[in-house]
């Protein structure tokens, strides 16, 4: 094995040469170890030969009794020659229920082939399939010709068929139809003969020994007791991959070989993966059905956000800043309108824009309650062309200026049913008393452009 001219090392540490078969000495050792009862996996580890190579050599030895490698390169010689195919057809005609391995034994017994030229069972089955397909094709053609002959001899009354110059029977020249013979039922002895599928006893002792060895190495399925299954399941709950010490301890406890325990854990892990996949599929299906029914699964963020924030336009989130008709004064709130973008150069009052009359000594008459009136509705436009409300009138019915805003009467201010009017000087003094005359003039123009008036 330690050839200096090797071209690689396999997964077991053994060297090999590409294009060269395994040495005959190694092949003989593989067969000897198999006769002693070693498993192919143990032979592979012991001789540092790949498992596939060991299995292939043993399979060829069981079938043909030889350990010599076949020819490398080129195509294999054709073993299903015409003589062999004719002999297979004769066997099948004489005994229609014959098996392929029986045909193979007959070819060897009749000295049609030897161990080197005998076709395999798959080759014989392929020949039988080809013969059956050819026979079916011939049968279909015969049935077609019989139908044509019957139609041609049918007495038609039509003048077109009577004018046909050449009769079909003379043109085709078919033989008269012969019915197929009836199939006689088989006797009891014939049934027993067909059901006997055991191969005949081979004359060679080495062939019989090979078959016995092959049956001995093919073990049956291991059956576990309830105590063994409980111990294995308990260990599987502890870990899916037990180490060698855990396997040895478990083997001594439940009286099973370590190799069987290792195989059981491998199969149990595969079963657990299948069950896990089914559980994930069922959970995803439940989630999809809940989403289709309109009941999404709540998340902590969504619950917290829904409890903390409300939409701006909802009645529950907006306090009622207008009292009922039986109250005479306007209540005060700490609401600050978002007017910093519109009036960036002005200081913002920390008061409600509709409650500054009370801060300056104003009083209003009772007015009807407005339920859907929000301050942000009045600041949606930056220019008078964007603003949805009409511009401020220029007559004296609008804003009435007064030099003494603290003593304004209620009769000077119309109620909200016809519009709200407040003195401009009171508005300016309430915003910032330290403004100059020019700034107050600009603010007065701005107030005329955007006055606060609900319709």
Swiss-Prot record:
Transcription factor that binds a motif with the core sequence 5'-GCGTA-3' in the promoter of various genes. During development, required for cell fate specification probably by promoting or repressing expression of genes involved in specific cell fate. Involved in head epidermal morphogenesis. Involved in gonadal distal tip cell (DTC) migration, during which modulates expression of the integrin alpha genes, pat-2 and ina-1. Regulates ventral and dorsal cephalic sheath (CEPsh) glia differentiation and expression of transcription factor hlh-17 in CEPsh glia. It comes from Caenorhabditis elegans. Residues 83-131 are annotated as: RED subdomain. Residues 307-329 have a biased composition (Polar residues). GO terms for cellular component: cytoplasm; nucleus. Residues 8-64 are annotated as: PAI subdomain. Residues 289-306 have a biased composition (Low complexity). Disruption phenotype: RNAi-mediated knockdown causes defects in gonadal distal tip cell migration. RNAi-mediated knockdown reduces expression of the integrin alpha pat-2 in gonadal DTCs in about 70% of individuals and in 90% on a vab-3 mutant background. RNAi-mediated knockdown increases expression of the integrin alpha ina-1 in gonadal DTCs in hermaphrodites. RNAi-mediated knockdown induces generation of additional dopaminergic neurons. BAG sensory neuron-specific RNAi-mediated knockdown reduces expression of receptor-type guanylyl cyclase gcy-9. One of its GO terms (biological process) is regulation of cell adhesion. It comes from the Eukaryota. Its main location: nucleus. Belongs to the paired homeobox family. This is Paired box protein 6 homolog. Residues 5-131, 217-276 bind DNA. The gene is vab-3. Changing residue 75 to L: In k109; embryonic or larval lethality in a few mutants. Male tail spicule defects. Almost abolishes expression of hlh-17 and ptr-10 in dorsal CEPsh glia, whereas nearly half of animals express both these genes in ventral CEPsh glia. Residues 274-329 are annotated as: Disordered. GO terms for molecular function: DNA-binding transcription factor activity; DNA-binding transcription factor activity, RNA polymerase II-specific; RNA polymerase II cis-regulatory region sequence-specific DNA binding.
